[in-house]
C-alpha cells in the first residue's frame, strides 16, 4: 500500500507540472520598457503578447489627460496599438494616430477624435518600478488610470 501511495503522489506531482505553463510561456506574458529612453513627441512601439503597444512621452504642448502616466516630471500615454473599430494598426502623424483602414483618428491621449472608432485605444495592464514599466502586470498606476477611463 505504501508503494501505491508513493506512486500516486508522484503521478500527481507529474500531472501538476504538466498543467503548469512553461517558464518560457510565463515570461512571454510580460514585456519591460524603460521609459527613460523614450524621446518626447516620438511614440515607440513595443510588442506585448503579440500586440503592438504604443508608448508616447508627451511634450509640454500636448494636453493633460487623466489617462497620463506621470513618472518623475514626465507624462506618458500607454495604449494597445490596435484601432478599436476593426483592429488595424494606426500610424503616428503630427501629434495624433491615424488609422488608414477607415480614417479613424486618436489624439496624443489615445482618445478617439474622428471617424468610426467607438472608444479610445485600449489600456494594457502595466506596473511601474522607477522608470521601467512591465506590460502584463497590474500595478496601482494601471488601476488608477483604468478607473478614470470607466468614469
Residue map of PLM features:
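Rieske [2Fe-2S] iron-sulfur-binding domain
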Residues: 57-151
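A broadly conserved sequence feature marking short terminus-proximal activation segments
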Residues: 37-71
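C-terminal segment of N-terminal export signals and the immediately downstream linker at the start
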Residues: 6-51
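N-terminal secretory signal peptides and thylakoid transit peptides that target proteins
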Residues: 1-3
Amino acid at each position: 500500500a505504501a508503494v501505491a501511495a508513493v506512486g500516486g503522489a508522484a503521478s500527481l506531482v507529474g500531472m501538476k507540472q504538466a498543467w503548469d505553463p512553461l517558464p518560457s510561456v510565463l515570461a512571454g506574458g510580460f514585456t519591460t520598457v524603460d521609459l527613460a529612453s523614450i524621446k518626447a513627441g516620438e511614440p515607440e512601439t513595443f510588442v506585448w503578447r503579440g500586440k503592438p503597444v504604443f508608448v508616447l512621452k508627451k511634450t509640454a504642448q500636448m494636453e493633460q489627460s487623466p489617462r497620463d502616466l506621470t513618472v518623475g516630471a514626465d507624462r506618458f500615454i500607454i495604449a494597445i496599438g490596435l484601432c478599436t473599430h476593426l483592429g488595424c494598426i494606426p500610424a503616428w502623424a503630427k501629434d495624433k494616430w491615424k488609422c488608414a483602414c477607415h480614417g479613424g483618428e486618436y489624439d496624443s491621449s489615445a482618445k478617439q477624435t474622428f471617424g468610426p472608432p467607438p472608444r479610445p485605444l485600449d489600456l494594457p495592464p502595466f506596473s511601474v518600478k522607477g522608470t521601467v514599466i512591465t506590460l502584463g502586470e497590474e500595478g496601482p498606476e494601471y488601476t488608477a488610470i483604468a478607473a478614470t477611463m470607466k468614469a
